[in-house]
Amino acid sequence: MSTQGINPFHQDAENIATVIEEELLPKMGNIEPEGIFFYGSGCREDKVEMMCGILGKAFPQCARIEAQGDLLAAARAVCGEREGIACIMGTGANSCLYDGNRVVENTPPLGYILGDEGSGAVLGKLFVNALFKGQLPSELKDEWLEETGLSLNIIINKVYREPLANRFLASTSRFIHQHLSVEPLELMVVDNFREHFRCNVNQYGRKDLKVGAVGSVAYYYREQLEKAAAAEGYSLGKVMRSPMDGLVRYHS
């Protein structure tokens, strides 16, 4: 069962409670959970009490309720109860040092304008830049523009004037993945991942630990991620598109 996304940073308590009441509870029928473990983007420390309160009202018979951020979800999914380094690589990117129970260190990702190395948004930014500055074959540029119906003016407008520019840039990933046989394009993907290791993972000073990753970019570009990890002196651990299966194992 699933609902629309819940982000306690962007949504207020009333909105979240409505989502749970209208989208989750009807699907659960007579199921009475013994424990609820909520993990979500935007679930910072100052939002934990709010989320636990909302869930407590929705499930008054539940004995155990926890709310945590998506970074801990990724760490528990790929590392389980072992010490390790965990990364999120989707539209955005993040990473942490994990001690087998909690996040003990986190290099701030800074978003796709200032950081987010290894993310789909940054990959898209590199791709568009390389296309229009002659760093990739001209036929690749022509094919992409024809396939998407975009032009330079439209792209500039989407990036600088429309909302969710990060998602637009990340949407180039599908085309990039289909053309990895173009050598400079694959090298761009590998270099984007290498920058993630250099700028973020290296800060933990733990090349002895395996690096696991969650997210669509990590999952679909696993081969390139493995090349980048090896080039930077790391060993790649588990890679998952979604943390759900790993979290089920962790809490079982």
Model-inferred region functions:
Residues 41, 70, 216:
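Cofactor-binding loop segments of dinucleotide-utilizing enzymes, especially the Rossmann-like FAD-
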Residues 10, 39-45:
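Alpha-helical substrate-recognition element adjacent to the catalytic core
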Residues 35-38, 68:
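Glycine- and acidic-rich phosphate- and metal-coordinating loops
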Residues 44-139:
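Phosphate-binding/catalytic loop of phosphoryl-transfer enzymes
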Residues 1-35, 56-58, 78-85, 126-252:
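ATP-binding/phosphotransfer module of carbohydrate and carboxylate kinases, centering on a glycine-rich
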